[in-house]
Amino acid sequence: MDKKTRRTPEIVIIGAGFGGLAVARGLRRAKANVTLIDRQNHHLFQPLLYQVATAALSPADIAAPIRAIVRRYRNTRVLLDSVVSVDREARLVQLESGTSLPYDALVIATGARHSYFGREDWAVDAPGIKTIDDAIKVRSKILVAMERAETDRQENPVTRSQHLTFIVIGDGPTGVEMAGAIAELTRHAAGLDFRHLSPSCVRVMLVQSDTRLLAAFPLDLAEKAKASLEHLGVEVRLGNRVTNITADSVMIGDERLSAAVIVWAAGVKASPAAAWLGAEADRAGRVIVKPNMSVPGHPDIFVIGDTSSVEGAGGRPVPGVAPAAKQQGQFVARVIRATIRRRRPPRRFKYKDYGNLATIGRKRAVADFGRTKLSGFSAWFVWSTAHLFYLSDFRSRITVGTQWLWSYITFDRGARLITGLGDGMMPTTVWTDDAPKE
């Protein structure tokens, strides 16, 4: 920012995720005009999206309107728009609507997208889960598959088996959590709510080219996670490289695995921020930033969260997780506040690693806090508490906590609604002796 200017500084934040909202919150009392831009009108708690996809939670449980979150931030306005480009020399952000926004400081917190490692054509048949729409579509596909299996029980047993086969690709926390949740949903629903399905008919597979799960965790915890998945009936297939994906199958070498639902959780890449800025990026497309989170040569532009690459302790990159994005947002807000006040800003972001958590299902999780390692119920309790804490508002914490308690007591997943699919995706009704016409 130009320290000679006397007018009110214009701060533009692109992205209302954990990082972007942390910046807005940190600047809520600053003598500046803050503009927060996002393509969606809601802030989404992405770590729990898989629970929407597996009917444990409803979309509104993990999302909140951005305008409601920043309602009390008197210096902040919200724009529902998409960024087209950034003119670094003119200090302008060009929006899809045609609006040009001037800035004195720009914060880019646009997150990450799924990476298919050059096979973007797989995205149609193996969707990842990054948005509410993604989660609803996956949920509906899972539930439709079970309905079809119930309807087709007198037809080809091979086809029926395919309706009850679900494949998750990816060995990180998202893949592990998704596979465990699908297993719990489908097996409990098959046993309780479908007259002609058995839990033993359900097949859930977790496929990954690596030779172990959860690379960020110690090996002993990874093995415990694998054992927990297998206890739920998940087939864990490690060292299996996916060579092709179609609408109803996954190819592993020459082996063809038929499936009704395929979910991608194998990799991410950054948003196009590096292209907007013409900045240096790492292999994942993340903008390489200085220790103070600014872009080299542009002290007025900051990149945070999954969009950035910055060294942490020991020279290792700071992980792309919600706590890191939130801490970076808080740090950048301090830098901007200090600059506005013409004080010396902090020079280096220091990430406080509070550990790694992954849940496998009901009462099953792993937690790595360095010297302290947890698994089983204790890790699951810590995981649940931590995720409730990071939800955006008190209402969401109460709603999610209550739903989890109800599900824990009853095994019931109340959000089993089939929505968002065309009529062509719905099962064809077949009348049988024990299913009378109405």
Q: What are these language model-derived features?
A:
Residues 74-85, 183-291, 295-297, 344:
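A Rossmann-like FAD-binding core segment of flavoenzymes
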Residues 124-156, 248-251, 256-327, 334:
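FAD-site-proximal beta/loop scaffold in flavoenzymes
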Residues 159-217, 224, 235-237, 319-348, ...:
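Rossmann-like dinucleotide-binding core of oxidoreductases
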